[in-house]
Regions:
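Short, conserved, GDST-rich strand-edge loop motifs in beta-rich repeat architectures
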Residues: 28-45, 89-99, 147-155
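Beta-propeller blade signature
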Residues: 41-57, 99-111, 154-175
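Loop/turn-rich, solvent-exposed surfaces of beta-rich toroidal or solenoidal domains
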Residues: 66-109, 187-193
Length: 221
């Protein structure tokens, strides 16, 4: 049995875990639970992050933030190599027709940012689950969902998201910048056409005046 010093992690389920490259740091995020570990006395939605240091055999709570969102997290989370951010799939498990949303968590303070579009998932049975993976060779995130219904049917789906994932605001901002750039290109093109047409008309008018000019006759003394 391993003995860890430091902060206590209360009993919970529906929590997520991320591991660093050398497997010395384990991050545990969120879930549902309570101090006693007895579901009969109720459960709380947890919004906290713990760091388990296997080398130091210690547990440290990095933060615990209040949240208005009642969300649980998929078991597998993705930790960035610099251990500054964690990517996690969160969803309201109490909804039968629920949805998964990818979030980026800041390890230092717990700031959450929604990324990409949501993924629909039917969560009728407790065995229904979702998982998140990252392929460093293709730079893609993979989400798999396994759905069970009351008739015993199973449906497995896979979704792919190219890295780096961006937020909806960033997509809108990029679209606005692209539209502005296109608008300026059309304006500059219009100015260029006007200058070209004006130059051609000026040259033609000048040549016409030169042709119509009558030379004065010189007087002979």
């Amino acid at each position: 049995t391993l003995s860890y010093s430091g902060d206590r992690i209360i009993p919970r389920y529906f929590s997520g875990m991320a591991v660093n490259k050398n497997r010395e740091h384990i991050y545990v995020f969120g879930g549902m639970g309570n101090e006693s570990g007895e579901q009969s006395v109720g459960r709380n939605y947890l919004h906290d992050l713990y760091l388990l240091d296997r080398k130091q055999q210690s547990v440290r709570r990095l933060w615990q933030n209040a949240s208005d969102h009642r969300l649980v997290v998929a078991r597998d989370m993705i930790l960035t190599p610099d251990e500054k951010y964690i990517y996690a799939l969160c969803y309201p498990e109490y909804l039968s027709d629920t949805y998964l949303q990818l979030y980026r968590l800041t390890v230092d303070d717990g700031t959450m940012k929604a990324l990409g579009d949501s993924i629909p998932m039917r969560s009728e049975e407790i065995m229904t689950n979702a998982n998140l993976y990252y392929n460093s060779l293709t730079h893609e995130y993979y989400c798999t969902t396994t759905e069970f219904d009351k008739k015993g049917h199973t449906v497995i789906r896979t979704y792919v998201l190219s890295a780096p994932p961006v937020s909806l605001d960033e997509i809108r901002s990029y679209g606005s910048r692209s539209s502005l750039e296109i608008r300026w290109l059309w304006i500059m093109a219009g100015i260029g056409v006007l200058l070209l047409v004006g130059g051609v008309l000026f040259v033609r008018r000048k040549r016409g005046k030169q042709r119509n000019a009558v030379p004065e006759s010189s007087s002979v003394l």
